[in-house]
């Protein structure tokens, strides 16, 4: 028998307890600008840390391979219904452990090994699972990659030409580091011209889509995948969505289980349900509006500080910065900003001469700082401090002074009270 007091984490494993405490401290004292990160609510974390973690539940709600699933069934059913309502679809699979797992399931459902897939190049802002040669998607399948035009938008002419030449079985519209708006209709027209399945990866913009502030990929796409964290502000996990296609939905069901996963993580699914409920509240729309406003506030200052922004600016929550003119690499800038209590990630830019481990760019975003309560004034401050450090990487005085100012700002906006 366990005692919550006697068997607490602090009493059981002091090393892990201390590591978590240090991470809590870091999250409080640092400004989080990584575009794919956010802060989950206490309710989401409570569900994820619940006794549902103990329950095995292979299969789907109402059709399990284990007994005793009547209560976890409630959680999964609620998660599905809320996801359907949030995105206006009639099918949602809430079981994928991650966005990559959701993408893998779609591949598994509609393709055979060796089939051709057309996706965005990693260097242009795509994701590993969109056909990168180091990923399963570029090893098992014949991957063809499209990029950006000189204006910084998706090169739809190139997409159409590559589709005509290679006849892909599936086209992926989505990104990991692109600050523009995707034209789903154009992608649909291109996909129809070669009879390809069209998949949208909305992992980065799902919250904006749910709030009606970014174009919904439906009815243009056959399937959409997303993570449940990032702009959705839920637990780390994946989600598959489709509409008006029961045959395809059936394939996705079996592609997840028994295709690539066994028992679902019921504690995470419960946490997803909570996050979806939060996202259905009117306040979530206000939050997403502020996410866009804050991204624009940072864009304004960074342009004034002569930091080059790929695609000329942002129309979503993220900005991809080309810092070549500073004389420092993305790796150097990431480390310097970390010492200044500003967390970012180094990121390749289009036609980057440096390796992905070094890079010439940084990717930043506004979801986490907006959750924290930052408005335009704070975001302008942060952008100025970021520029100060990026132009002075390794300058201990600048880094230390910035770290002090960041910590003082963070004290005014605690993540959790």
Swiss-Prot record:
Modification N6-(pyridoxal phosphate)lysine, positions: 230
Primary enzyme class: transferase
Subcellular location: Cytoplasm
Alphabetized GO MF terms: glycine hydroxymethyltransferase activity; pyridoxal phosphate binding
Pathway named in the protein's UniProt entry: One-carbon metabolism; tetrahydrofolate interconversion; Amino-acid biosynthesis; glycine biosynthesis; glycine from L-serine: step 1/1
EC number assigned by the record: 2.1.2.1
Site (Plays an important role in substrate specificity): 229
HAMAP family for this protein: SHMT
Family: Belongs to the SHMT family.
Name the UniProt record assigns to this protein: Serine hydroxymethyltransferase
Organism: Francisella philomiragia subsp. philomiragia (strain ATCC 25017 / CCUG 19701 / FSC 153 / O#319-036)
Gene: glyA
């Amino acid at each position: 028998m366990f005692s919550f007091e006697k068997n607490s984490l602090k009493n059981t494993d002091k090393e892990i307890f201390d590591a978590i405490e240090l991470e809590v401290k870091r999250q409080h004292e640092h400004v989080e600008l990584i575009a794919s990160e956010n802060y989950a609510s206490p309710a989401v974390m409570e569900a994820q840390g619940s006794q549902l973690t103990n329950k095995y539940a292979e299969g789907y709600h109402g059709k399990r391979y284990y007994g005793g699933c009547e209560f976890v069934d409630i959680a999964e059913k609620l998660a599905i219904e809320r996801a359907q309502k949030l995105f206006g679809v009639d099918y949602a699979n809430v079981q994928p452990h991650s966005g990559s797992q959701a993408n893998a399931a779609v591949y598994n459902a509609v393709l055979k090994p060796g089939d051709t897939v057309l996706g965005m190049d990693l260097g242009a802002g795509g994701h590993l699972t969109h056909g990168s040669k180091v990923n399963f998607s570029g090893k098992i399948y014949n991957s063809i990659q499209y990029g950006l035009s000189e204006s910084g938008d998706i090169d739809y002419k190139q997409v159409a030409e590559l589709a005509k030449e290679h006849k892909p079985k599936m086209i992926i519209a989505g990104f990991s580091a692109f600050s523009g708006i995707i034209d789903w209709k154009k992608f649909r027209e291109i996909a129809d011209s070669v009879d390809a399945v069209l998949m949208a990866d909305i992992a980065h913009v799902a919250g904006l889509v749910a709030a009606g502030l970014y174009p919904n990929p439906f009815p243009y796409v056959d399937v959409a995948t997303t993570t449940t964290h990032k702009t959705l502000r839920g637990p780390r996990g994946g989600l598959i969505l489709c509409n008006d296609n029961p045959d395809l939905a059936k394939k996705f069901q079996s592609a997840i289980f028994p295709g690539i996963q066994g028992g679902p993580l019921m504690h995470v699914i419960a946490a997803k349900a909570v996050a979806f409920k939060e996202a259905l509240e009117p306040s979530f729309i206000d939050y997403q509006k502020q996410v866009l406003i804050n991204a624009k506030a940072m864009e304004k200052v960074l342009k004034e500080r002569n930091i080059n922004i790929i695609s000329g600016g942002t129309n979503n929550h993220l900005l991809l910065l080309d810092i070549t003119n500073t004389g420092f690499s993305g790796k150097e800038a990431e480390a310097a900003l970390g010492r200044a209590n500003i967390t970012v990630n180094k990121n390749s830019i289009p036609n980057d001469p440096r390796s992905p481990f070094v890079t010439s760019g940084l990717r930043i975003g506004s979801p986490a700082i907006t959750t924290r309560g930052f408005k335009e004034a704070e975001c302008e401050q942060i952008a100025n401090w970021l520029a100060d450090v990026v132009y002075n990487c390794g300058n201990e005085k600048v880094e230390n002074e910035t770290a002090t100012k960041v910590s003082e700002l963070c004290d005014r906006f605690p993540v959790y009270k």
